[in-house]
Amino acid sequence: MSAVTVRGVALGQGRPKIIVPIFAQTAADAAGQAAALGATAADLAELRLDPLRAGDGSLPDAAALCAAVRRVRAALDGRLPLLVTLRTGAEGGSRPCTPEEYAALLGGLLDAADAFELLDVEFAAVGQQLPALCRRAQAAGLAVVASKHDFAKTPPRAEMAAALCAMGDAGADIAKLAVMPAGPADAAELLAATALARSRRPALPLITMAMGPAGAVTRVCGGAFGSCATFGTAGVSSAPGQPDAARLRAALDALGGCLA
């Protein structure tokens, strides 16, 4: 697959990269988590903007979100690439907003494009606007991670592969898919869908995982099927089933060349 390289980290080349989430209700706490990431196994950081709240508990506007991004970048001190994610309630996040509000907030985040490298864009939320959003973000120097999450089930293999391919066809630099397995068979379906999508779009970097305990194996061995990154925690989890980043790094190192 073709690599997307950000701050010297090549997504789609070598072993799967470990993304560690920053998940906090205040910008100060988010910056504190960011400052501690240098001592972890993180290859990249993900700033989740959806849990952030203003001092009075209200939802921060785009300007406040941009300020939070800049504060986290300063705390990271240039050490790690930063993925910025505003996860909506419809896909497991804590930011209630309409599709129109979501698209407007993403557009507003481009004002801070010099402070991060990758922007998560929910495929279902933006729909036919994805190509235009990709072009705007890419013109601002960002790589786009188009994403789709299903917290209720694992769709059929063909449907999952088609979704990954569609995100790439719409202009995303990376396609991400997360599903909820009912058991090991569903986890295997997710891995098979990853391999199928990779065979159909060999140049498109993919990030895939099955969530929860039944999906844990996909977070470790996904690279063998075509996933270029996985999520691990450094004390704070942003999704069910995320393993400790240090233990995840040890597992990936043990598997070695099978995941390259």
List the model feature ranges, each with a label.
Residues 36-37, 72-75, 109-113, 137, ...:
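Generic structural signal for hydrophobic
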Residues 1-32, 259-260:
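N-terminal amphipathic alpha-helix/helix-capping segment at the start of soluble metabolic enzymes
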Residues 58-90, 111, 133-146, 192-204:
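Alpha-helix-loop-beta-strand connector modules within alpha/beta enzyme cores
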Residues 14-18, 41-43, 77-82, 115-117, ...:
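Short, well-ordered coil/turn segments that N-cap beta-strands
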Residues 31, 58-71, 99-106, 160-161, ...:
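Well-ordered, non-membrane alpha-helical segments in soluble/globular domains
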Residues 25-38, 97-110, 156-166:
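Short, acidic/polar
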